[in-house]
Amino acid sequence: MNEFLPDSCLLGVMLAVSSHSGPQVIYHYPPSNRILETARDAHMNQQLGTTGLKRETEGRSMKSRGHPGNWDMNSELDSDLHSSKMERTASSSSSSSLSSPSSGLSDSELSTDYADWSTSGSSSDSELDLQTPDDSRRSQLENAGARSTRNVSPVSMSRNTSLGREPKDNGQKISASKLLDILNDPKSQFTKINTNDTNDDQFNMEEDDDLIEFDYMTSEKRVDITEEFFTEANYQDTSKFFEFDIDFLAELCCPSREMCNTRFELTVDEYCFLGHPIHVDSSGNWRKSRKRNNSLSKSKRSGSLTGSRKRSGSKSSNHDKSFSAETPNSPESSKIIEEVGSLHKSRTLSNPQNDHFTKDMTMFHVCFIMDPNLIEYNKRVDDMYQYVVARLSVLLRYLQSKNDYVSEQCELILKEKEKVFKNSKHYKSLSLPSEKGRYLYQRLLAKSSLARALTECVEKIKKNEIACLEITDHRTVSLQIPIQNEFSILPQYKLYPVLKGSFLTSIQNNKFLEKSANIDDNHHAKSARDTNLISDHVNTFSNGQTKNEIFYSKNMENALTAQNDYDDDDLLLYSILLLDDPDKIIADLDNYSSNDDIGGVILKQLVKVIQPNVPLLSYQYIINELLAEKPLSSSTTANKSKQNKDNKTNTFYSALLRSCALHLIYWRHARAILPISFKNTYIVSPLSPVEADNSEMIKGNRKPSITDLNVTSNSSSKIPVIYLNQQSFKLKFPSLPSLPTFLNILSLGKPKAFGNIIPSKEHKPIYMAALIWLIQKGYLTQLLTFVYIRVDKKIKMKVDEDLEKEGFRTNRRRRQEDNVDNKLLSTDENANEPPKSTKVDINDNTLEGRDTEYDSDSFDYDDPEFNHDYTIILEPERATALEKRWIYKCIQDQPQDIKILFNKVMKYMNGRTAMETVMLKEHISRHDIKRLLTSLGNYIVELNHW
């Protein structure tokens, strides 16, 4: 059982939609044959002898559930069948490539638009060198459209193609509408040569345009696919997805409305289909708007931002207008643009039914395919749904309700498929199915932002990395499955493997992220009053804030509320420990934020100056300097309005610092720890990577992936990590003892403060750097102090005596009152009775009443706890009346300053809150805490734990 090891068990993703014409699969990834992949993966695992992980082939191979030995015959048989299939496909493709000299079309191209698109032809992927068009044609088109290609976003550029359906046959085909355009050309009635030249120019123009755009997207690194999926051995026909027909999966993953808008989980054989299908309601809305007026106003504002992209959509022929606006006004370029625009216009008008695709779509479903082990099934599937599936589906539903994003992207993908299958000469020139498939997927990824997002999501999550998906130009979402690399309780790592180098500490970083997520759900109304302040600052300081998800106004509202509701454990009281070099972290921040983003600027500056021995709250001056504002005024002479403004600004700066820290923690760049000090006590962690090798080690404790966990065949991978780190430690700190010796010094004798091993003051800087390095690598963990209140039998007896004294005085008053009442209410029937017996009855009734009163006050002397020699108070803040008397009796004879200090700290003496944390929360010095614990003496129980 490997629950603690990072393994998403993710295989692929599929986008299925349902419209009036029925369900269909729009996009799926990867197009790979899983049997061949798992056979190679099993062989690799058998060769390397790995037991902890099943996914150790550079993060791209998929694990096998069967025995490695059973795959040899099946994989060989499947390889033979696949190779024979490719030979038949290649021969048919080569035979169909002969075109007629009269019309430029082969017999197989004379087809109709009503071909079955649901079962696609075999298009494969392998290593492919893209063939560029002639230099003359390329230079001619670059003069006309290179500038437009650079400036127009890939989504807006790709919405001008026509919707098409994937043909069933493998041969080259051309749609009937395109054939009619050629035959109806007036020039074709007079001269056959002019007709061929004109149409060839149009097709070449379109092909050049697509290739230039594709080259641009490749240079911008927006097209990134795994080459292993597109080899001849691993490639699988696009009509199948993990051994299932596409039509079958379309019916399977498009449930009825009653089963939509909730969790979708279906197991077929060893595969688990997990998703969250989104269906329109009875009124045709994708989601219910809580505030219709606000949503309408927001939609108007968003319409102004996305209007240019929508106006350049596929429903009109405005592509040539926007294209020509960015190009020089030369006759040659204008002629080329007119030809391209007319071709796009004719293709768009030839398929009028495509314009209704957006209105016809009633459901979409992003379905992920997994293969978890049976013993880990619940955990793997639940984590995948909670952290990836649900969040991505909700975001796509929001975008679909706002601007029909999903339906437009689906239409765009279908159009691009038809364009590649019917019009791409480069696609037809390829012989192998794997090469065709690779080219097809590259074109789809270059055109569709949704296809890129789904592909990147699969690639990153499979490698246990963070997937930063740029859905649109204004929407970015980060998805990840958190790795288990921190523990508050020592796990049974011999039975259940864990990542070596994990952190063993009570300071759990996940709780800060969970609190931020809980604020999203529970405190929208409470933070609404600060929305105007936040929006004003964001609009003033940042124009590119959408490039970084942590600086959305929504998250800033949440950060403002965190200090009010979680003041007992504020993130600003902790320090930030960077887990990698600052230069690498800044380089990563540059990839996901723009230069003018105020959030990115603050983050970069914070990474440069941050130190793990300084609380995060001390870095507020960075924001003041970057925003060029004067220090906040706190003078008593300032008026009330100015003080309120300063308080709001200070709250905003604190929220911004908190957001920066959460960003670094979420992206695994840093950890929140207690400020490092020489007065703290540090011990060697039981989870330190002393006996681990490279396969069990988190490299730098940063962004672990399957690549990091991979075991190579080199002998160096089996060397314990401590010997590898010993060299780095020696190079970094040459004047210190070796790493094993240094750890041995910390392990000898009783744990003591780290400053006791420093020989002199001159050695403090280098010892501080060594301490930070050891904590980064997971070798050391801080030993914390936890306290319980202990009440012994003497305190209980004193409290018992006090209660008896108070109870005696109460009985005396009640006895007198009862005597008076009984004398007034005496009857003739009781007049003959002696007074003595009357007193006895009164006393008995009084005692019963006293017992009843004390029972109501929870003073139960028959409680077994009362008779024990001592009692530990687990919750001092919620102690009973009797327990409170015990507690205050313990400090009755203490000085007044000790009593005041005890009242501050008493609620934290529950055995769960470290005294080192109390020092930060209550601003109490270490000396005062030590004096308090010494004064209480035997009345406390002190525990040392991580």
From Swiss-Prot:
Residues 146-163, 324-333 have a biased composition (Polar residues). Residues 287-301 have a biased composition (Basic residues). Residues 91-125 have a biased composition (Low complexity). GO terms for cellular component: GATOR1 complex. Residues 79-88, 836-849 have a biased composition (Basic and acidic residues). Residues 48-171, 283-334, 813-849 are annotated as: Disordered. It comes from the Eukaryota. Keywords: Meiosis, Signal. InterPro entries: HTH_NPRL3, Npr3. Residues 1-21 form the signal peptide. This is Nitrogen permease regulator 3. It comes from Candida glabrata (strain ATCC 2001 / BCRC 20586 / JCM 3761 / NBRC 0622 / NRRL Y-65 / CBS 138). The gene is NPR3.
